[in-house]
């Protein structure tokens, strides 16, 4: 389908929706609600189409003036200049229109749950989890996003076996979803006397946060165990059975929550994580059925499956998916200045989607 015919089809759809919304018999019905939502979604696209078409019309009228033998020389010169300006604007408008037609990820407006886990590399990998955790906290702070800790599992000497937390705010999942995958670190550990460079890894999973109304979980599918929470080394933290382990029997997914002193709060947080994981599982199945272009697996934590490498010796960060390298590692890690990478990943994703709809 050509570029122009796509827009003609959208204009026709917009006209039909307008008719449906003005029909008295649809008022107050579910059909009215659906049509109203579709109409609102199309409004900004229709505005761009109108601008694109009017620019095309203006160019045609200006070219007619330029090519007319009766046009005054001074007016012809002005018309030629104006036509040149409008022709330069047209590709930009066309690109904006193409972007507006890209398939939307319905989860982009959701909040996110991040789960960072140590991969290969022992204690050094656990320390790197802490680096990534603090980096994302700083990034959230820069964006004025709200962070809530879900589960922190430390190693006792400054490292983290796991750090999971939710982030809420504008465009959270839309921007952070590209962080899913294996992050590799190359540096000399403080305990390394020979100064030898070590390579370790951590996995990052970014899940869309799901409300209870979006995903119902049957109580019959859950096994809920309660026990006393424990800290590093296994010592008891609470004298009451406040820790909660929820097993989703059909999938085998297990969520453990013990950060809160209240059993009720731990259960609530565990269910939030379980909903996100189940939703993500269903989403992955849908994506695999529709297209093999993108998969959301984060890998096993093996160093070879990396999406990004952090080389502390060279102060270098390289994102291997888009071949982008920055030598501002210290600032990125300590200040959470991730926009250079995330903006580039968003642009790359848009470019790939454009190829899909234009070929």
Curated annotation (Swiss-Prot):
| Keywords for this protein | Cytoplasm, Methylation, Protein biosynthesis
Q: Which Cys residues form disulphide pairs?
A: none
Q: Does the UniProt entry include the keyword Protein biosynthesis?
A: yes
Modified positions (N5-methylglutamine) are: 235
Q: For this protein, what is any one GO molecular function term?
A: translation release factor activity, codon specific
Tell me the compartments it is located in.
Answer: Cytoplasm
Cellular component GO terms, alphabetically?
Answer: cytoplasm
Which modifications occur after translation, per UniProt?
Answer: Methylated by PrmC. Methylation increases the termination efficiency of RF1.
PROSITE patterns, per the entry: RF_PROK_I
Q: Which NCBIfam families match?
A: prfA, PRK00591.1
UniProt similarity note? Belongs to the prokaryotic/mitochondrial release factor family.
Question: Which function does this protein serve?
Answer: Peptide chain release factor 1 directs the termination of translation in response to the peptide chain termination codons UAG and UAA.
Recorded protein name is: Peptide chain release factor 1
What organism is recorded for this protein? Anaplasma phagocytophilum (strain HZ)
Highest classification ranks of the organism? Bacteria, Pseudomonadati, Pseudomonadota, Alphaproteobacteria, Rickettsiales
């Amino acid at each position: 389908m050509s570029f122009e015919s796509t827009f003609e089809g959208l204009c026709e759809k917009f006209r039909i929706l307008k008719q449906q919304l003005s029909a008295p018999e649809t008022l107050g019905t579910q059909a009215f609600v659906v049509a109203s939502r579709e109409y609102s979604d199309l409004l900004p696209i229709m505005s761009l189409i109108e601008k694109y078409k009017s620019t095309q019309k203006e160019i045609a009228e200006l070219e007619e003036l330029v090519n007319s033998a009766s046009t005054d020389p001074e007016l012809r010169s002005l018309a030629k200049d104006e036509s040149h300006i409008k022709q330069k604007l047209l590709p930009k408008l066309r690109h904006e229109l193409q972007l507006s037609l890209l398939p939307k990820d319905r989860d982009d407006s959701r909040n996110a749950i991040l789960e960072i886990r140590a991969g290969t590399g022992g204690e050094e990998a656990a320390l790197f989890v802490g680096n990534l955790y603090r980096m994302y906290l700083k990034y959230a702070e820069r964006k004025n996003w709200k962070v809530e800790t879900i589960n922190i599992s430390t190693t006792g000497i400054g490292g983290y076996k796991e750090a999971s937390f939710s982030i809420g705010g504008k465009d959270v999942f839309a921007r952070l979803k590209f962080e899913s995958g294996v992050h590799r670190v190359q540096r000399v550990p403080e305990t390394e006397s020979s100064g030898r460079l070590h390579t370790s890894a951590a996995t990052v999973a970014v899940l869309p946060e799901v409300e209870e109304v979006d995903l119902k979980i049957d109580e019959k599918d859950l096994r809920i165990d309660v026990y006393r929470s424990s800290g590093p080394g296994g010592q008891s933290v609470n004298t009451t059975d406040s820790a909660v382990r929820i097993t989703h029997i059909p999938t085998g997914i297990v969520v453990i929550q013990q950060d809160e002193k209240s059993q009720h709060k731990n259960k609530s947080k565990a269910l939030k994580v379980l909903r996100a994981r189940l939703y993500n599982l269903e989403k992955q199945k849908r994506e695999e059925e529709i297209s093999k272009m993108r998969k959301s697996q984060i890998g096993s934590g093996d160093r070879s499956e990396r999406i990004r490498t952090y080389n502390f010796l060279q102060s270098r960060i390289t994102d291997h998916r888009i071949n982008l390298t920055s030598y501002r590692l210290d600032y990125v890690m300590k200040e959470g200045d991730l926009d250079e990478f995330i903006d580039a990943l968003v642009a790359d994703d848009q470019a790939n989607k454009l190829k899909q709809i234009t070929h």
